[in-house]
Amino acid sequence: MNKALVTLLLTLGITGLAHAAGDAAAGQGKAAVCGACHGPDGNSAAPNFPKLAGQGERYLLKQMQDIKAGTKPGAPEGSGRKVLEMTGMLDNFSDQDLADLAAYFTSQKPTVGAADPQLVEAGETLYRGGKLADGMPACTGCHSPNGEGNTPAAYPRLSGQHAQYVAKQLTDFREGARTNDGDNMIMRSIAAKLSNKDIAAISSYIQGLH
């Protein structure tokens, strides 16, 4: 096989694996269906629905793809991400649609939340220091000191996220109800080391982090 053909095949392979670029303007029109729960600009008013505004584009796209796969009728146990409230919501969206939605919500400005003053100290200790005696690293390593996350690595933005939603996700990771954190099970292994009090404190701290 000549070098030119090899190069062509490699190029086609790489192109086939690449995700379509999202169009924020197109995503705005497609986001109307999302507004009832997540707010028109991705800043949800209900504490059980996550804020999407300002979230990392790669992370948002992956979560939507996982939720679409995990909520399909007959989806194998452990596949994707199962979110009961999202059942059927993404079925008619193409990969390009999802990319456009991710681009739109990423472009929106997130609102700032507030932490419970009584939980700030405990939450800050966990977020910035982890529980080293138990082998739990600080959250700052992946999610950054100010909670902005790591966009290239698809680690989510946490800053200002609703405490109720964060607590639910940590609990789900701890109990194995959410499993889309990769083969290394990083969030499941971390959440396994958190008590209910730990989860309440760190979730509240994250809500006020900015």
From Swiss-Prot:
Entry's localization field: Periplasm
PTM notes: Binds 2 heme c groups covalently per subunit.
GO cellular component: periplasmic space
Residues that hold heme c 2 according to the record: 139, 142-143, 187
Signal peptide feature range: 1-20
Keywords: Electron transport, Heme, Iron, Metal-binding, Periplasm, Signal, Transport
InterPro entries: Cyt_c-like_dom, Cyt_c-like_dom_sf, Cytochrome_c4-like, Cytochrome_c_Oxidase_Subunit
Predominant localisation class: periplasm
Annotated residues for binding of heme c 1: 34, 37-38, 86
One Gene Ontology molecular-function label: iron ion binding
Pfam families for the chain: Cytochrom_C (PF00034)
Described function: Diheme, high potential cytochrome c believed to be an intermediate electron donor to terminal oxidation systems.
Record's protein name: Cytochrome c4
Organism: Azotobacter vinelandii
